[in-house]
Design a protein with these regions (language model features):
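Catalytic histidine-centered segment of alpha/beta-hydrolase-like enzymes
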Residues: 242-254
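Catalytic nucleophile-loop/oxyanion-hole region of alpha/beta-hydrolase
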Residues: 84-110
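Conserved alpha/beta-hydrolase
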Residues: 66-88
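Short alpha-helix in the alpha/beta-hydrolase fold that links the catalytic acid
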Residues: 62, 218-227, 251
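Short beta-strand/loop motif that positions the catalytic acidic residue
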Residues: 201-202, 208-210, 214
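N-terminal cap/lid segment of alpha/beta-hydrolase-fold proteins
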Residues: 13-41
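Acidic catalytic loop of the alpha/beta-hydrolase fold
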Residues: 213-217, 245
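The serine-hydrolase catalytic nucleophile loop
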Residues: 54-66, 220
Length: 263
């Protein structure tokens, strides 16, 4: 059984330099809001970035994509899920359903053109869910080390699992930081599982980029996605020396090329 070793630092690679966009809020009522940045141009295609678990819109991939789109006149949106970054909500109170709802709110309220969605790690799961529910709007998908169903394979010890069953949560310590994994996160994840299906009814073109040295999500995950999706236009790009970060210049270049090709 492959275990996901999600770490806070694995998804919080900072983008060196100043902020490249003005942060705004999408107000959703009941004091809920999503923080986002968006290019001011209009274009035939809108690019949206779905980040990873405990990541935010200041991460390397999000900012690199945003800057690329800004300089090339492409409408682009990056944002923080509920309980992440500057958005409202407490991380440990949120679930896959909440983060999927964040994606839907952004897509429906902040974009109108056909979409190219870039999903990193957990964002790769959310981009597939969004493509299933908003298929007519999605022009293409780019998965960066996509991690569908990761809640089924979290690397927790027996004592952590016992604590979670007893108290509803456990603390995961990784890379000099700690965060809470809740039972409701795992239970809710079961509602959105994809890899247990015979076919995933996503029909749009997609590019999946995965590092062969990824010790968080095995690259075979992207191969499995490619087999299961209904789309006949799927490319899998394996980066032999790539880790889960995929934040090196080569991997970032592959991401931008994939976005360009899908536009």
């Amino acid at each position: 059984v492959k275990h996901y070793r999600f770490s806070y630092n694995a998804h919080r690679q900072s983008c060196v330099g100043a902020v490249v966009g003005e942060e705004k809020r999408l107000e959703l009522g009941n004091s809920s809001y999503i923080s986002y940045m968006q290019t001011t141009v209009q274009s035939p295609v809108s690019v949206v970035f779905f980040g990873g678990f405990m990541s935010d819109m200041r991460g390397t991939k999000a900012q690199h994509l945003f800057e690329y789109c800004k300089s090339h006149g492409v409408h682009c949106t990056v944002f923080d899920y509920f309980g992440h970054g500057s958005s409202s909500g407490e991380f440990q109170e949120c679930t896959i359903s909440d983060w999927y709802a964040s994606c839907v709110s952004v897509v429906e309220s902040l974009t109108s053109a056909p979409l190219v969605i870039v999903g990193s790690s957990m964002g790769g799961w959310l981009m597939l869910l969004t493509a299933l529910s908003h298929g007519r709007r999605v022009r293409g998908l780019v998965g960066m080390a996509p991690a569908p169903d990761f809640t089924e394979s979290l690397d927790l010890s027996e004592s952590q699992r016992a604590e979670m069953m007893r108290t509803g949560k456990t603390v995961k310590n990784t890379d000099n930081c700690s965060y809470v994994i809740t039972k409701k996160l795992i239970d809710d994840g079961k509602v959105h599982l994809l890899m247990n299906k015979r076919e995933i009814a996503v029909e749009c073109p997609m590019v999946l980029i995965h590092g062969m040295d990824d010790d968080v999500v095995p690259y075979q995950t992207s191969l499995a996605i490619a087999k299961k999706v209904k789309s006949r236009d799927v490319r899998v790009h394996l980066v032999k020396s790539g880790t889960h970060h995929l934040a090196d210049e080569h991997s970032l270049g592959l991401m931008l090329k994939a976005v360009h090709d899908l536009m």
